[in-house]
């Protein structure tokens, strides 16, 4: 699973590089990004909450009650309903593409060039919706059988197909621009199809056999709806925020969604690699404590998870901040120019300041899921999203902060949501060790500032290379990254941060493997 996830991350980086080379940081890139995100939005809005939050636990329950055949019957019911509903939704979205796209571009109007380009892409991208539904069911069945490799490596195959599409687009764009755009749109949709269709043989091998069965009155369907409702409320609120983010970034600049897309890739990387793994592990521990009625153990796990998340993410945030320009310099090729590097890097350097708060807020979401109080959390999130959307509207105007209004709005949103979550969590399970958490956070921030200054001085005072470009950026990232991380985590040891033992334990394991 780890190898599969790593492969998906690496090919995702190459995919973004290919997009930067082919499209640059332009109006067309914004149109592509918005249109390519819309199928995900529509899928999550209609079926994502059911399939991601409720399908797996109900499937396991049906297998426990009625055996493999009962599980197959429930799966067929969900699969058939999903394909019918999402198939119709794909068709409707294709026909009414301008109206759907207007939900993301209402700040610039339907006649704007970016809206028209987004519409043309989305007419083809709309058919991704049904494949996302198919994938949601397949992934649930395979995960129920603890088969994780194919589901983790499949996104890499998607990325490979899309990379090939970008490569094909480059020469075609000089011959027939309309054909080039169609190839890119079809290739991107084909990538999503490949990602999930490639898993069908594993689905069959797992023991599943399809049945032509549909029943809305099935008790298992009602249980699915009951479990999924809090997640659906949470998802809908976040999708509203995502819609306004797109719309107000477009009002700031036509390349707004493009800028945010490139910056978001680096923003998400440390969270996806480090924080998600930790929160997934701690979710199991928290759930186990809840099942045993061990409130002290639950509080201990919540506290340990928060401390561990912040300890690992704060230094990585510092590295993203100080290396923001070299990181974006990796895309300095083709249509992605030096001005694009500077612009996206400046947005990333501001946005990344909210990364520790974002990671902590997402961890607290897991805590609420473990104690089965997601409904209360979701209702609080609605109020916080209202604040977030209001800040987007107020700050993202060209004469205020422009595109920088989005990261500032997100910082406030995650801060408010995090504080509200801690207050609500205290109501349900008691107070966490806030004094120890704050002390650890302050020490880690000081260590990060110390290491960040050293890396900044290294890059500014002692030039690592006299030439610009991808090679120079890579050299700065490697040398600056090694020096920075060693200095930052080393400083936490000097400051006696307890969580340093996590790094020490990891280093010992790696040393042991190297000896073997």
Please provide the spans of the model-predicted regions.
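Membrane-embedded alpha-helical bundles of multi-pass transporters/translocases
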Residues: 1-516
């Amino acid at each position: 699973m780890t190898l599969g996830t790593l492969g998906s991350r690496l090919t995702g980086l190459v995919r973004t590089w290919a997009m930067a080379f082919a499209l640059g940081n332009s109006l067309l890139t914004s149109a592509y990004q918005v249109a390519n995100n819309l199928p995900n939005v529509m899928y999550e809005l209609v079926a994502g909450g059911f399939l991601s939050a409720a399908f797996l636990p109900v499937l396991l329950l049906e297998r426990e009650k009625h055996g493999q055949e009962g599980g197959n019957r429930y799966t067929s019911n969900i699969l058939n309903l999903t394909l019918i509903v999402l198939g119709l939704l794909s068709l409707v979205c294709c026909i009414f593409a301008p109206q759907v796209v207007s939900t993301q571009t209402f700040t610039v109007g339907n006649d704007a060039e970016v809206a028209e380009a987004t519409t043309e892409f989305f007419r083809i991208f709309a058919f991704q919706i049904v494949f996302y539904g198919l994938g949601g069911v397949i992934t649930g069945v395979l995960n129920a059988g603890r088969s994780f490799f194919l589901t983790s490596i499949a996104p890499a195959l998607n990325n490979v197909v899309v990379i090939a599409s970008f490569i094909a687009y480059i020469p075609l764009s000089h011959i027939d621009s309309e054909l080039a755009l169609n190839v890119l749109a079809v290739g991107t949709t084909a990538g999503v199809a490949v990602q999930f269709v490639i898993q069908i043989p594993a689905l069959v091998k797992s023991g599943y056999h399809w049945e032509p069965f549909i029943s809305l009155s099935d008790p298992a369907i009602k249980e699915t709806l009951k479990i999924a409702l809090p997640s659906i409320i949470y998802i809908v609120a976040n999708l509203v925020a995502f819609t306004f983010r797109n719309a107000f970034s477009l009002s700031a600049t036509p390349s707004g969604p493009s800028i945010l897309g490139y910056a978001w890739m680096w923003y998400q990387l440390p969270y996806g690699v480090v924080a998600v793994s930790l929160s997934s592990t701690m979710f199991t521990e928290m759930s186990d404590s809840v099942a045993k009625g061990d409130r002290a153990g639950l509080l201990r796990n919540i506290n340990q998870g928060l401390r561990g998340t912040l300890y690992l993410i704060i230094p990585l945030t510092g590295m993203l901040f100080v290396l923001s320009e070299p990181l974006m310099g990796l895309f300095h090729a083709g249509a992605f120019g030096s001005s694009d590097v500077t612009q996206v890097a400046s947005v990333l350097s501001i946005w990344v300041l909210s990364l520790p708060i974002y990671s902590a807020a997402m961890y607290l979401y897991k805590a609420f899921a473990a104690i089965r109080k997601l409904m209360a959390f979701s209702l609080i999130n609605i109020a916080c999203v209202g604040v977030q959307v209001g800040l987007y509207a107020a700050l993202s105007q060209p004469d205020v902060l422009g595109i920088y209004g989005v990261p500032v709005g997100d910082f406030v949103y995650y801060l408010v949501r995090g504080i509200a979550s801690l207050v609500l969590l205290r109501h349900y399970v008691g107070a966490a060790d806030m004094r120890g958490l704050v002390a650890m956070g302050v020490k880690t921030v000081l260590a990060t500032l110390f290491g960040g200054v050293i890396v900044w001085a290294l890059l500014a005072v002692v030039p690592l290379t006299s030439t610009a470009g991808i090679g120079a950026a890579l050299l700065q990232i490697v040398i600056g990254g090694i020096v920075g991380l060693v200095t930052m985590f080393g400083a936490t040891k000097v400051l006696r941060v307890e969580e340093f033992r996590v790094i020490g334990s990891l280093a010992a394991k790696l040393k042991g493997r190297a000896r073997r």
